[in-house]
C-alpha cells in the first residue's frame, strides 16, 4: 500500500500577512500565488500534548486578528473603547463580532494570554508595516457614546478633555488642552498662520495728529509732474494736469482720499516711512525718540585724565 503524502506544515505568507496552507508541490500561497512564504514552528502546547492545534483554536485565532498590539496611543474611560497600534499593513479598520457573540478577553484571561503567546510565537520579530487599529471595549452599557461618536465630538470641539477624565495619558499625540487649540483638517495650519499674521496688523507707528493731517498743503499737478509719469504711490493712478493732491513734508504727493485714511492709522509716509515731523519711523521707532546713545563723549569729558591742567601763575 502506497504511503499517504505528508501533510504540509503551517506557513506564513509575507505578502498577505496571514497564515496559509501552501499549494503543493510548488509551495506557493493559494491566495496571491506568491512564493514569499515561511514555515512556522509547531506550537509549544501542541508539541507537549503530541497533537496539532484544533480546528476550533485555529478558527478562534483567525477571528481575533488584533491580539498582538502595542501600548495604546491614548485611553478613554471604560466603555468608550481605546486606540492602539497594531503590526498589520492594511488601512484603519474596526473589528466587529457576529451578532450574539462577545469577546472573551474579560471573562477568560487565561485564553487571552494563550492567544497573546501564540501570536508572539507565530510572528516573532516579523512586524510588517504598522497601522492604526482599534478595538471595541466589551460590556458597553446602553446610552454610552460609541467610539466614532467620541472622535467626532473631539474634532468638532463639542467636548473638552476636562469632561473625559483619562484622556491624554498616551506617549504621542496627547491632547493637553482644548481641542480647538489644535490644527484639525487640511486647512487647520493655514488658519493658524492667518491668525498669527493678523496679530501684526495693528503694529507700527501710532496715528498722526488730526491737526497735522488737516494742515497738509494741497498743491496742483504741473506739466512737469505729468511729463515724468508721476503716479499716486497708494492707488498707482497717474496724476492729471491741474489735479489737486496732498503733499507731505517729505515732498511725496498723494491723492487726498488715499493718504488721509493711511495717516489716520500710521504717522508715516508710505514711501519713505518718515513721519509728519520728519522722523524716520523705520530706523528710529517713536518709543526711542529723544534717547541718546552717545555715551563716549560724555564719558571722555568726565574722565579725570582729560581735564586741562591748571595754569601756574
Swiss-Prot record:
This protein's domain notes: The C4-type zinc finger is required for interaction with BAG6.
Post-translational modification: Ubiquitinated. May undergo autoubiquitination.
Comp. bias (Basic and acidic residues): 104-117
Required for interaction with BAG6: region residues: 5-101
Subcellular location(s) per record: Cytoplasm; Nucleus
GO cellular component entries: cytoplasm; cytosol; nucleus
Chemical reaction(s) catalysed: S-ubiquitinyl-[E2 ubiquitin-conjugating enzyme]-L-cysteine + [acceptor protein]-L-lysine = [E2 ubiquitin-conjugating enzyme]-L-cysteine + N(6)-ubiquitinyl-[acceptor protein]-L-lysine
One Pfam family linked to the record: Zn_ribbon_19
InterPro entries associated with the record: RNF126-like_zinc-ribbon, Znf_RING, Znf_RING/FYVE/PHD
Classification via PANTHER family: E3 UBIQUITIN-PROTEIN LIGASE PRAJA, E3 UBIQUITIN-PROTEIN LIGASE RNF126
Organism: Bos taurus
Record function comment: E3 ubiquitin-protein ligase that mediates ubiquitination oF target proteins. Depending on the associated E2 ligase, mediates 'Lys-27'-, 'Lys-29'-, 'Lys-48'- and/or 'Lys-63'-linked polyubiquitination of substrates. Part of a BAG6-dependent quality control process ensuring that proteins of the secretory pathway that are mislocalized to the cytosol are degraded by the proteasome. Probably acts by providing the ubiquitin ligase activity associated with the BAG6 complex and be responsible for ubiquitination of the hydrophobic mislocalized proteins and their targeting to the proteasome.
Comp. bias (Low complexity): 292-313
Single Gene Ontology BP annotation: negative regulation of epidermal growth factor receptor signaling pathway
Ranges of biased composition (kind: Basic residues): 118-128
Annotated region (Sufficient for interaction with AICDA), positions in chain: 203-306
Subunit structure comment from the entry: Interacts with CCDC50, EGFR, FLT3 and SCAMP3. Interacts with BAG6 (via ubiquitin-like domain); required for BAG6-dependent ubiquitination of proteins mislocalized to the cytosol. Interacts with CDKN1A. Interacts with AICDA.
PTM annotation (N-acetylalanine): residues: 2
Record gene name: RNF126
Pathway: Protein modification; protein ubiquitination
Zinc finger (C4-type) in chain: 13-32
Residues the record lists as Phosphoserine modifications: 5
Name of this chain's protein: E3 ubiquitin-protein ligase RNF126
